[in-house]
Regions:
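Binding-site signature for planar aromatic cofactors or substrates
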Residues: 1-206
């Protein structure tokens, strides 16, 4: 007997979730996603570019008993590395040393990454499993951003099961301080050039 693999969206659409979708009258729309195979399961070039541009990520884990925990990780653009179409990795910097994420992953590898780009109002959800690598100095060094002032303690490797993009609804539009400063600098330079041109024209007309 040939068994059909469940759609990848079942990572999120559990029986309980599907029951709520039925009750809300939205099950047909989500069933259509499942009939197409579910969520994407490979990192596309577009997604890889999006990941490489991020300076922030939220990593969710849970204990064996299901107690959830979410932790922020940040760094310069490129601190998140796409190793292949199923793997994302990053150097895990020393922090508050509570080690809740590491403890959770030691007993439950299920993990979730949430990426959000406020400037372009885009968010990506990624389900998978994560593992901690503490004894590979070469890997950790390769993942460490150049000239970044942080001390890496270990690496975290995330193996993708499925991912999905959300609509931009209710995402406040915010911009990186460096981008705002660059835009203001261009405006100030333009104003200075126009003021100089006005002064030149006035001097010529005098």
């Amino acid at each position: 007997m040939h068994l059909i693999d469940p759609p990848s969206s079942d990572v999120a659409f559990t029986p309980s979730v599907k029951a709520v979708q039925v009750r809300k009258g939205l099950r047909p729309a989500h069933r259509a996603i499942e009939e197409r195979g579910g969520f994407a399961t490979r990192i596309t070039p577009d997604l890889a570019g999006f990941i490489a541009a991020q300076t922030s990520v939220f990593l969710a884990t849970a204990s064996r008993d299901g107690q959830p925990y979410i932790q922020h990780r940040g760094g310069p653009p490129g601190f998140l590395h796409v190793l292949d179409e199923r793997t994302i990795a990053f150097a895990d910097f020393a922090g508050n040393r509570q080690y809740i994420t590491l403890g959770n992953l030691a007993e439950n590898p299920k993990a979730y990454l949430f990426l959000i780009d406020y400037a372009h109002r885009r968010r990506i959800k990624l389900w998978g499993e994560a593992r901690v690598v503490e004894d590979d100095a070469e890997l950790i060094g390769r993942l460490m951003p150049a000239d970044y002032k942080a001390r890496p303690e270990q690496a975290i490797l995330f193996t993708l099961a499925a991912w999905s993009a959300n609509c931009p609804q209710h995402i406040p539009q915010r911009f990186e301080a460096a981008d705002v400063a660059a835009a203001l600098g261009e405006r100030e330079a333009r104003i200075a050039a126009l003021e100089a041109e006005v002064a030149r024209l006035r001097a010529g007309a005098a």
